[in-house]
Design a protein with these regions (language model features):
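Charged, compositionally biased boundary regions
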Residues: 1-233
C-alpha cells in the first residue's frame, strides 16, 4: 500500500510466521512461530457457496444498476472538473476521499445508508490507492456496519471500480471470521483488477488460513489512534 510506513515485515509459510528486519528483509528476527490456522487449507478459488453468500457480493441489477450508472456519470464529471481546477490533482483526490470516507463512516455508525451519489463518489475515489489505504485504516471490523458498508458498495460499483470496495469488504469479512465471504469478495476485486496488490495479499492470508488476530497485532501501529496517518501527497 502506498503512503504507509512499514513497521513490520512478516513472512508466513506453512503455518508459521517470522518477523524480518524492515531495513534488511533477508534477516529474520528470531525463529518461526507456529500459529493456529483458522480453518483447513482451502483452494484459492472459493468452493460452491450458498446463494445468500454469493448474493452478498453480486452486482446490483435492473433499476438499481441503472441508477448507479447515472450517478457515476455525474460524479466522474464533477471529479474531473475538480481535478482540472486543482494545482495538485492527486492532493485534491486525497482530500475529497478522506472527507467521503469520514462522512460514510459517520453516517453508517448512526445507522444510516448512502444514497446513489454518495456511494458513487466514494467508490470512484477508492480507485486512488491513498484513499483506499485511508479507508482501510478506518476499518477495524468491530461492528457489523463495517461489513455492510463495504459489501453494499461492492455490489453497487460499476465495472472498473469494484476492486477498492470489494477488497475492503474482503478484509472486514476475514477480520470477522467469515473466510468464505472474504474469499468471494477478494475474487470480485481480482476479477475487476487482477493486479490489485492488497487483494492479492488478502488471498494469500486466506490461503494460509492466517488468523485475523495476528493481523490486528501487526496493524495496531497503523491505526489512526496511533497518530500515524497516510500523508497528504
Amino acid at each position: 500500500m502506498h503512503g504507509l510506513p512499514v513497521m513490520h515485515l512478516v513472512r508466513v509459510t506453512g503455518g508459521r510466521y517470522v518477523e524480518h528486519d524492515v531495513h534488511r528483509p533477508e534477516v529474520p528476527l528470531g525463529d518461526p512461530v507456529p500459529f493456529t490456522r483458522t480453518a483447513p487449507d482451502r483452494p484459492s478459488r472459493p468452493a460452491v457457496v450458498g446463494a445468500d453468500l454469493a448474493a452478498a457480493v453480486a452486482p446490483v441489477t435492473g433499476t438499481a444498476a441503472a441508477a448507479m450508472l447515472a450517478a457515476f456519470e455525474q460524479v466522474r464529471a464533477r471529479l474531473d472538473t475538480t481535478a482540472a481546477q486543482s494545482g495538485s490533482p492527486d492532493r485534491a483526490v486525497l482530500r475529497l476521499g478522506r472527507a467521503a470516507v469520514d462522512a460514510a463512516v459517520r453516517r453508517c455508525e448512526q445507522g444510516g445508508t448512502l444514497d446513489d451519489l454518495a456511494s458513487a463518489e466514494l467508490i470512484a475515489l477508492l480507485r486512488s490507492d491513498e484513499v483506499r489505504d485511508f479507508a482501510y485504516l478506518r476499518t477495524d471490523g468491530s461492528d457489523v456496519w463495517h461489513l455492510r458498508l463495504w459489501l453494499g458498495l461492492t455490489r453497487r460499483a460499476i465495472p472498473g471500480y469494484v476492486a477498492g470496495p470489494a477488497c475492503l469488504a474482503g478484509y472486514v469479512a476475514w477480520r470477522t471470521h467469515r473466510p468464505e465471504l472474504a474469499r468471494l469478495a477478494v475474487h470480485r476485486a481480482l476479477s475487476d483488477d487482477p493486479g490489485h496488490a492488497l487483494a492479492a495479499i488478502l488471498l494469500q492470508l486466506l490461503d494460509e488460513s492466517v488468523p485475523p488476530e495476528l493481523a490486528e497485532l501487526l496493524l495496531a501501529h497503523h491505526r489512526p489512534d496511533s497518530g500515524m496517518e497516510p500523508p497528504m501527497q
